[in-house]
Amino acid sequence: MPTYRSKTSTAGRNMAGARSLWRATGMKDDDFSKPIIAVVNSFTQFVPGHVHLKDLGQLVAREIEAAGGVAKEFNTIAVDDGIAMGHDGMLYSLPSRDIIADSVEYMVNAHCADAMVCISNCDKITPGMLMAAMRLNIPVIFVSGGPMEAGKTRLANPVTKTIELKKLDLVDAMVIAADQSYSDADVAEVERSACPTCGSCSGMFTANSMNCLTEALGLSLPGNGTVVATHADREQLFKRAGRRIVELTRQYYEQDDVRVLPRSVGFNAFENAMTLDIAMGGSTNTILHLLAIAREAGIDFTMRDIDRLSRVVPQLCKVAPNTNKYHIEDVHRAGGIMAILGELDRAGRLHTDVPTVHAPTLKDALDQWDIVRTQDEAVRKFYLAGPAGVPTQIAFSQDTRWPSLDLDRAEGCIRSYEHAFSKEGGLAVLTGNIALDGCVVKTAGVDESILVFEGSAHVTESQDEAVENILNDKVKAGDVVIVRYEGPKGGPGMQEMLYPTSYIKSKGLGKACALLTDGRFSGGTSGLSIGHCSPEAAAGGAIGLVRDGDRIRIDIPNRTIDVLVSDEELARRREEQNAKGWKPAQPRPRKVSAALKAYAKLVMSADKGAVRDLSLLDD
């Protein structure tokens, strides 16, 4: 039988000093016989997805203590990718994932906590906490702050001149700002309307993608990824998480039930998560994060598995930025993640024998929570939770409900296998002589007319240079914009490229250009945007050998990407580049701190999840 970890600092005569300090935090005599559960919060006033979390840690703590545990809350950092984007602040975003994982490990191990409730929400916080959960392998439940409501405003269509009601998100603000056909007044109106409430940005961007994937991994409660942050129903997720973690903790330490440990989800749960991601056209960043989380779990889940799944999993859901018709709030109305998993199950694409934190198996969970098969009216009411359309930073501030569920599996937000948006899913892995270890593309956001594309390389060696060239009309129809030396090592930090892709769209080139980078993309990116090119330029990858004017051929159906240059010429260029060193031809006006240099020294390639190369730490 496992021993409670907390006994290390709470039991025995020699721990009198530690107990004295525990007492100074408010613990009483009878608390020393209870499990100590860490409430891992991520409140910050910098990030709309986290601005409402301040009191939610204590909400969970009260439920833990009512259920017989001792709750101790601490915070991690949280970077807002949207605010950090487009300048050197983005260098810190991906590295913050590892800092978050480390900080959770440090706090939980230093104080010998028995279990965790992780309160996450935005882009790097959920994956960082998931990495920590797998590393620590103690009972855990994830509960997110929830998605933002979609914005809405009335704008004049620049083509038809008619006034239209437009649903909005962050990406719309970026695209319209660079589109000269819209007036300054229009831009100001969109700016004020695009992000109306607290919560993670309202489309299927990275934050919401990752929060949805926690449901597929079996580590969060149903609705975690889709109930809007403002709705009263989300409060129940926090309360249930607080009560349930005490039960899971006792199952492990008092009944030796290892099924409640996060690593017990196994390889099949990672396949389920990736299958969901492909089916819903999630962010390409999820690939990076799932690879990293699997490595922390000691699970051999690789790009090969992702490539295999991408060829057979259909796309059953299409949400912004891949369409303006639906946002996360609409996914919830259609039954949320459990509904997508239910359709995947009926298509024979799901492992349903994996454990979850709220049901013995995923099959049991689907029997209750898939609205197509459930008989539970409370579940149906739960998925009617909708947006109120009232700007606010206050959680649980409204209880609006949709008039009806979206059960249309032929033309609705979530489709059945027979009516899939496409028979192949929303993400793909491409390989070729320019990306020997692979690169990724969100096919859900690519127009069918450019699934096969050949164009002329327009080479840039920083995101800033790419943005400048796009805005100054140096990028033309038929170009493949190369943005290199922006990978995990080369950036360092693997910047997101939402501004270049948004500006390509605003210039009317969204169906006429491609962009290839060893950096990565925001979950808000759409178009022929190919990232994670591995090996990266700074590690000697062939993307560093491409020259202006080289022809590049992209074939998504056949999963290939090649620079149309002979092997002999590439070998000659490689010798030349080896002599020069694998770095930008011209110095970049970029401040790289000691912290970022340390990150670059240890980080591995994107196809390995951009995690630390632990072999470098061996004696």
UniProtKB/Swiss-Prot annotation:
Listed NCBIfam families: ilvD, PRK12448.1
Recite the UniProt cofactor note for this protein: Binds 1 [2Fe-2S] cluster per subunit. This cluster acts as a Lewis acid cofactor.
Which parts of the sequence bind [2Fe-2S] cluster? C122, C201
- Tell me the protein family, please: Belongs to the IlvD/Edd family.
Q: Provide GO CC annotations from the record.
A: cytosol
Official protein name in the record = Dihydroxy-acid dehydratase
Q: Which residues carry this modification: N6-carboxylysine?
A: K124
Q: What are the entry keywords?
A: 2Fe-2S, Amino-acid biosynthesis, Branched-chain amino acid biosynthesis, Iron, Iron-sulfur, Lyase, Magnesium, Metal-binding
